[in-house]
Amino acid sequence: MQIISTSFRFWKNSRISHVWKSLKRWICLSALILSGAFFNRQDIAARRSLFMPVNRSVPDVAQKRKNWNGLISGFKASDLVFLDGSGCNTDMTRRYAYSLGGSRAVDSAPLSKPKSTTILSSIRLDGTLRYTTFSGGTTVERFKRYLETDLLPHLNGNSVLIMDDMKSHHAKAVRNLLDSSGVRYIYLPPYSPDLNPIEKLWSKVKAFLRKFKARTLNALPNAIQNAFHSVTISDCSGWFRFCGYAL
């Protein structure tokens, strides 16, 4: 800003010809500064923006996130079991595609679609994924049934179940079930998906489903199964590490 203000003072007190010459030099300098070569030399690159929830900076939330590090450090990463849900449908398609220069990348997807399919899954450091699917949203009864039949029978006294602040996760019936099972459970701080490695799982699963393009409800279960089979132990350990959990 100092350079700009100085330049304008110079232009104001100079003849038009001098101003024009100075302006051309300024334009050339700006072009040089903003050139790709300049950015490369300075190791500056265009990157996808990382958006942080505004509520995360609220003192109460910030303190809970700070306390989380101390709380989670008391457990082994191999004992952590993260649980979450996500939705998918028959209109999923790739967001990016190749095309010839001067032409648009065109794809197709159905305009009408059935009720969304919900996937509930857990993720562990060793790559163990236990999931179920159903039509519609997550109710307390559906979540409780998933815990009873798909997840809790495979946990032990060392397991630590970790959930977010979704309403069904805090239901009294769910808490009673977990208390009676003897499994330890804790909740993530609010507005903290960055602390949950299962978010990375959803990213990979949905990328697979967009590529697979299951266009009927009959084809969707097979697509989901293949998506989960594509997840490796290396993926899971990398996601745990990315979220800050010591391996």
Question: Where are the regions a protein language model picked out?
Answer:
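A short, amphipathic alpha-helix used for macromolecular contacts
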Residues: 1-32, 74-76
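Generic structural signal for small/hydrophobic residues in well-ordered secondary structure
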Residues: 22, 35, 84-86, 121, ...
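Extended, low-complexity cationic-aromatic segments
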Residues: 24, 60-148, 245
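Acidic, metal-coordinating catalytic cores used for nucleic-acid/nucleotide bond scission
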Residues: 26-27, 89, 138, 161-174, ...
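Major-groove recognition helix of helix-turn-helix-like DNA-binding domains
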Residues: 31-43
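C-terminal anion-handling pockets and recognition modules
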Residues: 34, 77-80, 198-247
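RNase H-like polynucleotidyl transferase catalytic core
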Residues: 104-112, 181-197
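RNase H-like two-metal-ion nuclease catalytic core shared by retroviral integrases
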Residues: 164-165, 172, 186-210, 218
